[in-house]
Structures are given as structure tokens and as C-alpha cells.
Amino acid sequence: MARASSSSGPLPPLANVPSSWAQPVGAGEERDEGRRGGLGLLAAVSVPCPDFSRQPWAPASASGPMPFALQRLRATLLRLHREREQLLRARDCARHLQAVVRLLRSGSSAGSLSLQQLHGDLQLCPSRGAALRLGFPGSRETLLLTRPVGLAAQHLEAAIEMQLRSLGRTPASLGLTSQLAELLLALPFYHTLQGHSLNFVPGAARPFPAARVLQLLAAERGCQVADKLAEARGGSGLQEQLRRQCEQERELLPGLLGLVGGVASTDSSGLRLGGPGALWSQYWTLLWAACAKCLDLRVGPWEDPRAMAQELSQALCQAPLPQECEKELLSLCHSLFHQSVICSWDQGFCQALGSALGGQSSPASLSPTSELLQRLFPPLLDSLRQPRPELRLCPPAGPTPVALGLCTLQTTLLWFVGRAQQHLAAWDPGSFLLLLQKDLPPLLSAVEALSSLASEAALTLEVEQQLGLEIHNLTEKMQLLPKESLGLFVQECHKQATQGFKLHMPRGRYWRLRLCPEPPSDPSEYARIVVYSVLEPVLQGLQGLPPEAQAPALGQALTATLGAWLDHILTHGIRFSLQGALQLKQDFGVVREVLEQEQWGLSQELRQTLLSLSIFQQLDGALLCLLQQPLPKNPVHRRPPRCCLCYEVQTTELPTSSLNSLENLAPPLRLGVSPAQNTHLLSTLGGGGRGGGGGGGPGPSPEAYLVGNQQAWLALRLHQHPRWHLPFFSCLRTSPEP
């Protein structure tokens, strides 16, 4: 500014004239000139007048009023003087901006310009107080000057940051240290400009404290290290490259940290980094954190993050590295492993959801959905077994393994319950039993392992602890699925059998027929229809399973079917004659007939186990109740009729309060029937056996046949009380079994 003013030469000061000369006319002239000159003249009016204490250039003895022409000349000179001052200051500001532009356009280091020249140019930037002293009354004129200064500070910040990043990408050498020292020496001058620009445009530029310089250098050098490590993948090259990069950084660090430490000591506004040890540790942490971040970005969807994590883990175990390096790279390995878990889980979960819409189980293999759900658990279990880094700059992105495990468990539970209900609603017991016996056990094992690891893992976050508790609760719920599913299966078997008996089992006279010479030898058609419709799909579904897996389901199905049979008889109050009881005994034998078929492949031990169920003893007890047919209270003894073929039955009165005497129950001996036929009838009745099939061998004790509703079964017997009796014509008597 001073050089510009002296080059043009100052104008001589105007003489001090009386105020009476200038006031009335000067004010008017100033207003006239302001209207003619526009904005520039208005700005000129506000410029302070020169100092009139100096020696006047005109004679001071002038007296009297100043002529009008002289007044106009004086006002014009004052205006020109002020405009000249403004132009000089604007020229100085333009020179300053040109210097900044030259710096920005240089494209090289800050040393391409002389530091003394840069310092001088930066000092030309006026502060807010200096701008006000220029005479600008409003904010518009101030912004016209200050906005370029703020813009220059922003561009200069970008140039310095670019130079620091460029130096960070330069290979380690002595030239790198000298270039960095040259750039760091220019930072105080930049901070001066940045402080001036903040007076006009807050936030126009940011300072460069030592922490920011260190972070920029470490970020670029970390990326360079990551590129070299990525190229050295495979074999033992990764381990050697890690060792080499650590040695190179150790050689560069003393000079680099010395320069940055010097900047930190001279910069009072920056972040203090502490002593040399703190600088060293912070640089290593930033360097390897940047390296880990770049390696993470280089692993795209076309690469396997799990393989890279394994290679890095092996290299870290074999190469002696700084603590900061091991810490950050181990965190990277954990992050890559977590990414691989999320990627594999996401693919498998989508496949399982798509397969859940269909996919039926086959006797030889698991259902496709069950296999896909099982594949989701091993990666999650491996992830929970991995040791978690104690401290990471940023946790891995995406859901945690505990959250993925909870989602998998919920999906498994919903799929199993929905599929089980679907099979039972369609009465497809084969698919249901395959789901229960083949698909559920391996899923339960995986779920229990997940719950065990989730409870043992060190879950520090409160959210993870809540997720672990949810996993534990759902695991307990899934452990009850076999029992609950079997209960639903029993209910559905009972329902299907009840509907079948209600639809097909006859009532009325079918069960009240008179006793025939030959006992029934074939079961009824309804028994085959109902028993086969309920038990045959169950036996088909259990084919190929071991006996220990067949026994529970088949036993429950038999219990439900036979229980529904007995309940149907009691509910509808079907009354049985002796002939009807014998026919019911043959109908019960259909169950044994089904179990003895060779196509189902049931072992002899399993058959004996099934036939020893308590439901078969209840069948025998009900049959014994029905076979104990009472006689009239006052029996009439008559001679055999001669006019027709009638039979007189000889019986003994049995107590009706207990069935203990049924072991000695003798069949009604018929007159006119051979002893061999009577013996056959005795064996038929006395061999009450298991399963209603007339099996040989001694039966259980009489107490085993006592049913809880004994009186209800006794009430279903057909009492033989004749309605009338004509002793003179026995052929017209009422049949005891109409």
C-alpha cells in the first residue's frame, strides 16, 4: 500500500478556508455531486477528510467570502482525492489476490513461491477494522472486498491439503522430509490469512493443526501400504510385505514426527498431541487404521472376505509387528469375518424363505427348507466362537451375530409350526411325522448350540444381552415342540377317527342280533375303513425310521384311534347283544391285523410293545363288560319245544357289581350243539387277549381289565327280559334278542 501511494505522489492539501465559505454551498454541491456520481460519490462523502493541521499550500491571508467557482473546484478536488485513495487500496487488494491465485495455479509445492513474498502478500489483506477505515459505510461494499479473501483462504486450504496428501503418497525418502518441511513452514502464513478470513466469512477455511496434518499423512501412507499388501496376497508374500512396510515406516517416522512436533509446538490453537511417545503411538494407530480401511474397501463382492481374513490372521501370527499394527489388523480380520458371515447368512436366508413356499420331505432325505435353515447356523456359531477385539475405532457394519441368530431361530420356529399345522390340517400324517422325526432333531441341536454360545459369549452391549435372553427363551420354547407337536398329532388322530366312526359305524339292530351258532369270523366293513384311513398314513410316514422313533408316534396314534372308538360307543349309547359283542371283538381285531402286515416292516418287539398299551386292556375290559349278558330275575325252566327249532340256554347268574368273576366266565351252552362247537365258543370268549384279536396265552389279571367307566359299559348290555310269555305256545314267545 505504501509503495502504491508513493509511486503516484500525494496531492497538495487544500487551504483551510472559513466555514462560512463552504457550508451552505458545499453541502448543496455535495448533494448535487452525489446525485450525479451515484454510488461512488456516496462512498466518497463518507471518507474522512485529510488532516488539516498540516501547512496549507495556499496563502492563509485570504479573507472574505470564497467565490462560488472556487467552492465548486474545492469540492471536486476533495472528491477526486477520495476516489484516488480508494483506487490505490483496491489496487493493493488486487495484487494480493493475484499472489494467491499464482499460488493456487502453481500446482506444485508451496515452496514454488518465495516465503517472504507470500508473507508480504498475506499482510496486505485488510482486517475488518481496516476495511471500515477505508470509508465503506455499508455491508455491500465490505463484502465486495472480503468475499474474495474468504474464497482465497478456502482455495489455499484445499491446495495445502492436496499437497499433504501428495506427500503422503510419495515413497519414503529424504526428499519427502525436505518437501514436507517446506510445506509446514508455510502453515503459519496460511493461519494468518485464515484468521483474517474468519472475520468476514466464518467457517470459510479450517486451520491445519498438528493432529490434522498427521491424520492426512497417515491416511495416504496407509492406503499405499494397503495396496502393497493386497498385491502380496497368497503364500508367504503377505508376511514379508508386512515386515518390510513396518521397517520403512520406522525409518521415516523420526524425521516426520519431528517436523509435525515442531508445528504442534508453534501452533497454540491446534490440538496438542503430547510427547514423542504419544506422537509415535498415534501415528501408528492412524496408519494401520487407514490401511485396514483400504483393505476392507478392496474386498468387493467378487472376493471372499473370509479367505482374506484367514490370510491376514496367519501373517499376524508369524510376523513380529508393532502392537498398533496387530490391533488394527486383528480388528480388520474380525470385520472381514463378520462381513462373510452376513453375506453367507443373507444368501442362505433368502434361499430358505424361497424354499419355505414348497419343498416336501422325502423318506430318504430332509426337506430342502430344513437343510437350508440348518446351513444358517454353522457360520453364526463360528462367529460367536471368535474372540472379539477389545477396542475398535469403528465396529463392523451390519447386524451382530446374536441378532442374526435370533432372526434365524424365529424363522425356524415359525416355519416348523406353520408346516406342522399345514400337514395336520390336510391330514397328511406321513409328512408331519417326517417333519417331526427327521427335520426337527437336527434343527433342535443347532438351536441349543446357538443358545449355549450366546449365553457364554461376552455380550457387552445391553441390546446384545437382551437378544441373548430372547434366544434363550425361544430355545426353551422349541425344546417343547416334540411334545406339543405329538399332542397336536394325537388330537388330530382322535378327530379323524371320531369323524370316521360317526360317518361309517352302524347303530341299532346291527349290534342287537340274536346269538348265532357260529361266532362272527370277519370284521365289519366300517372297522376296516376307519382304522385303515387313520393308521395306514401313519405307518407310511414311519417307514424307514428306527423302532425307537416309530414307537412314540404309533403308540399315540393307536391310543387316539381306539380311544375315539370307545368314546363314540359310549357317547351314542350303542347297545350290544352277545352276538353284537362278539362282532365288536372281531372289529377290534382289525387293529392287530394292520400292525401285523409285513409291508410296514414293524419288528416283533415293537408289535409286542404296542399291543401292551393300556388302551388294549381298556378294549378287553369293555368287551368283558359287554359279554356278561344278564338273564331274567326269575328264570322259567321248560321242556324243549317240539313244534319248532328253539333253544333254551342254560346260564348261571353272575354278579354285576364286579368283573372279577369274568375269568371263570363260561359260555352259554346250547342244546343241540356239539361239544366241539361249545368248546370253540368257550375259547373264543375266554381268549379275550390283547387287541381284541383273540391271541393265545394267559391274559392279565382281572384288575387290569377294570375300566374307570365300568358301569357305563355294563349299561350298554342288552337285558334279556321278555315282554310276554305264552307257556302253551313257546314258539310265539318274544325273542330275548329282537
Curated annotation (Swiss-Prot):
The keyword Coiled coil applies. Residues 685-698 have a biased composition (Gly residues). Transmembrane segments: none annotated. Signal peptide: none annotated. Residues 69-92 form a coiled coil. It holds the Pfam family CCDC142. The keyword Transport does not apply. InterPro entries: CC142_N, CCDC142, CCDC142_C. Keywords: Coiled coil. Residues 1-34, 682-704 are annotated as: Disordered. This is Coiled-coil domain-containing protein 142.
